[in-house]
Amino acid sequence: MRSIASKKLVIATHNTGKLHEITTLVAPFGLEIQSAKELDLPEPKETGVTFEENAYIKAFAAAKNTGLPALSDDSGLEVDALGGAPGVYTADWALQSDGTRNFSKAMQKIEDELQKIGAHEKSQRKARFISVICIAWSDAYADYFRGSVEGTFIWPPRGDKGFGFDPIFLPDGYENTFGEMSTEQKHGWKLNDKTPLSHRARAFKLLAENLLTLS
């Protein structure tokens, strides 16, 4: 694995919610952060069929354009009763004809699909969030870190915190959805200490323990 020697890192996302979460996770490590949106970098087409492939596409595009190491997250929701859908295509389920994303409609779409197959009980709605974080360099080298969290797709949505599908995801062992949790509840962790709750924080913890040092 390759360390981030320059202490400079590009966050390869134009998603405001995701950028906020990643920036919060990176903060203790004293890195100079810039986002793809700030740098006005183009958004590459996510043509991969795995989370790893799409994470690499985004990270390498930013690294190639800037000459700096770039971090990208590709994440999604897998619902067992739907054969793992929406999975790697999670963001596409929210895509509208004008190019924007409407996650309220996407959550409703999942609920409609579950109703169609008669998946009404909590036991029939097992789901998980998956996050793959990729750090890529301009020479095409990359490291990958995967995190996941098991839970249940619940309806109706609850909470207005977080972003995306957070209001419909109830993690196992908890009474609050991700949409009802504070940032600390969802992402809090310490190096070489407890396992964080969220999929993204779990992936980032692996990255930090392998590539980063506290500032």
UniProtKB/Swiss-Prot annotation:
Listed Pfam families: Ham1p_like (PF01725)
Note accompanying the cofactor annotation: Binds 1 Mg(2+) ion per subunit.
Enzyme nomenclature, EC number: 3.6.1.66
Names of the cofactor(s): Mg(2+)
Record-annotated active site: 74
Residues annotated to bind substrate: 13-18, 75, 163-166, 186, 199-200
Gene Ontology CC terms, in alphabetical order: cytosol
Catalytic class of the enzyme: hydrolase
Coiled coil: none
Family to which this protein belongs: Belongs to the HAM1 NTPase family.
Function of the molecule: Pyrophosphatase that catalyzes the hydrolysis of nucleoside triphosphates to their monophosphate derivatives, with a high preference for the non-canonical purine nucleotides XTP (xanthosine triphosphate), dITP (deoxyinosine triphosphate) and ITP. Seems to function as a house-cleaning enzyme that removes non-canonical purine nucleotides from the nucleotide pool, thus preventing their incorporation into DNA/RNA and avoiding chromosomal lesions.
UniProt name for this protein: dITP/XTP pyrophosphatase
Record lineage: Bacteria, Pseudomonadati, Pseudomonadota, Alphaproteobacteria, Hyphomicrobiales
